[in-house]
């Protein structure tokens, strides 16, 4: 907002037409409404697809879905008993750490163990300035499923470590179930967001509540105190806000 940037969510880009001033982007929103945007520069940063071309998959008899991803079962096995698939060529987020966990799970399954990947606790990090990280559900996803939830939010402006290094832009937001207090998701913008998200991932993996995080002693002064304060804020008990 400070930079005057506006976000138009859930808009599909239909076409981009160049002109002398830059370009015109034609879009359609989720309700079917069409809108054009006049732009100086267009940066295309999305649109990845699985690199399954050239693998001669058809000759092997491996089945693909409509998006050219390799079909697998819950154990990452394809329709052929001796072939497994993981990572960017199957469904799910195209993230290196997601693929790594899937590879470990496959090895465990082949060895007769019970390999498993919890896709609800796979973090995503955007390495910008400020850094952005997220895990679990978004507010939009919870609303779509009619899940009653609480929000805890804490600004880095009130975090001593962030203030000390003059990097206090951003916040930590935690979403918790309104009835059980179970942590459902989190979103962070600010210093070391990609590192701080791990604590919330561990909490979610163990089915922790926001109070579990809030009652865990965090060293002072650290960035992680913002996570604790956000957890306290879920029940409106933040200390330094």
Predicted features by range, described:
Residues 1-33, 92-100, 108-141:
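Rossmann-like dinucleotide-binding cores of NAD(P)H-dependent redox enzymes
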Residues 7, 13, 70, 149-151:
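Generic structural signal for residues in well-ordered beta-strands
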Residues 15, 61, 75, 173-175:
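Short, surface-exposed charged micro-motifs
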Residues 19-20, 66, 178-180:
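Short acidic-glycine loop/turn motifs at beta-strand connectors
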Residues 28, 64, 72, 99, ...:
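Hydrophobic alpha-helical segments, especially N-terminal targeting/anchoring helices
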Residues 36-110, 116:
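FAD-site-proximal beta/loop scaffold in flavoenzymes
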Residues 63-66, 113-121, 147-152:
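A short alpha-helix-loop-beta-strand transition element characteristic
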Residues 128-138, 143-241:
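Flexible, glycine-rich terminal cap/loop adjacent to redox cofactors
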